[in-house]
Structures are given as C-alpha cells and as structure tokens.
Amino acid sequence: MSAPVCTIAVIVPVHNAAKYLPDCLDAIAAQQFDDFCCVLVDDGSRDESPLLCDNMAAGDARFTVIHQPQRGVSAARTAGLRRALEIGAEWIAFCDADDLYHPAFLSTLYKAVQETHLPLACCRYDTFADALPAEAAPPAAVKRLDGPAHLDALLHDHAVDYGLWNKLYSATLLTPAMLDNDLAYNEDLLANWQAFCAAPGCAFCDWPGYHYRQHADSASRRGLPPQSLDDQRRAAALIRGSVPGRWPVLQQSANAFYYEKLVYLASMILRRADIEPYRVQLGELRIGITAGLNDRQLGRNPQLPFAIKVSAWATVHAPKLWRKVCRKYLKDRQ
C-alpha cells in the first residue's frame, strides 16, 4: 500500500508494545483533525505489534507501516521522519506507542501554528496509569514564546518538557541527523534543542493534550544504566556549547541548566542503595560540581535555583549527610 500524502505526519516508533498499542492507534485514528497520516515504525518487535500495525494499515488508509530490525527508538523515529519527508508532509508530530493523544491534539496544535505563524507548537501533558484523566477542553488562547524565551522554556519549564511527543514541528525544522544523534538517553532533548534553535519561537498551548502512560515497562521507569548518566551529561554539555549567537543572553540559562544537570545526576546515584557501580561517574560529577561552586556562570549563576545551590554545596562538603537525605526523600526516577 502506498503511503498517503498528508498535512501532518504522525510518527510512532513501536517495539514490543502490543499491550498498549491498540489504545494508542485508536486515539490517533479518532483525531478531530483528519488530514494526517501515521507512519508506524515496527522496530524489531517480537510480540503481536507487527500484526497490529499491519492490521491498522489494512483497515485505515491513513496508516502505513515500516518494518525494520531492532535499532532503537532514535533510529525508528528517523526512519519515520524519512518516510514523512518523502511523502511531502508539511508538519511532523510524534507519539510513543504506549501513550495517547487527546482527541483535539493535532487540531489544537495546528491551529496554534496557523494563528502565530510559527513553525513550532507544544502543549502540556498529564500522566496516567490505569484510568485516563478527564479530557480538558482545548485552550481559548495560545501563548507565543518568541526567541530566546522558547529555548529557556525548553530547558527550565517542565510544561514544555524535553519530549518530542507533545509538540508539532514544521517539516523544515527537522532533519534525520537531529533524531539519530548517537544518544540513547536525552536524545529527544538534544533534538528539540536543535529544532528550537532553528525556530524564531514556539506557540504554547497551556492544556494537557498528550497523555503519558506510566507503567513498570516505561523507559523512564527503568534502572540507572551508566550510559544514562553519560548521555545526559553529554547532552547538557552540547547544549551549553551551542547557544545561538543571535541570542547571547541565553548562555546564562544554558550554563545553569548544565550545572543543575550535574547536581541532579549526582543525586540520582546517591539515592541508590548500591553506589559502587557508579563510583567513576560520581567522582567525575563531584569534580565538575566542586569546580563550579564559586563560578558565577555555574554554581553562583543567578538563574540557578536556590535548592540546587544547596544541593551542590552538600554534595561537595557534606557527602555522607547528603546521601542520607537523598536516600530518604528523593524519589528514584530517570
């Protein structure tokens, strides 16, 4: 079946998601905005996901399927983007195979970019485990984040978030190289940073249009692989070193983000029962945190939250006490 031409292409990377995939596909099919196509990328699934994808494409011409050997979520998104660009989609959206769109997700974000004439829009998201939250009405107004405020929001506003899935992008903003960036963690943050840098601003819809499912198999709820620490630190360093020259005021924000990431990653290790596997990473993080304590661009950065400054001091000067605090009060999260 040839892929349909559409205004918006929704890209869904799929890997062993049969338990949740039908709900995800139903939510996409039920979108109030009808001029879309959906590229399902089966990334070497070994459950019923390939069959579910094929059945959906056979029954709804808006859906098309790519089957490929398992190469990871970034490679799957990249394959989907290549297909979307080949068929001439004007706008790109993403959805994870275990999550759900609000019925007005595409229509609301598309309306936002049309009204603001910006190449990028995003909305808030909510989380659910079993019962889906009540669907909120789309917002009456859209907030315009002109540069560099949109980049500052990407780094520091959890409503904007790092994810690719709560956003709508002009196809001119994204390239395959942005998505396949050699990171297994925070790959979406780095891709968003590059896309946001290429955009003059972002339309923000203060409304939970994306439903993020929390379950034991979620990537965000797994353990703490050493690569996660390395990739997150690398992403933050790349961001810090690539602030657009036209927005030099953003450098302070990027520096604060980098230092906060160091402190956060150290706390991720310290809250674990066994920190021995992370001795090397913890040592490197402590060196970076110590070096930045009295640096006006890092530990004394006015944009750095006070709680992070206290955490940085405790990491360096009261490590045993700080570990007890981390173990007792900080939730284990990715």
Language model feature labels by segment:
Residues 115-118, 271-334:
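Membrane-interface aromatic/basic loop that binds lipid-linked glycans or pyrophosphate carriers
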Residues 16-30:
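Short, well-formed alpha-helical segments that are part of the catalytic scaffolds
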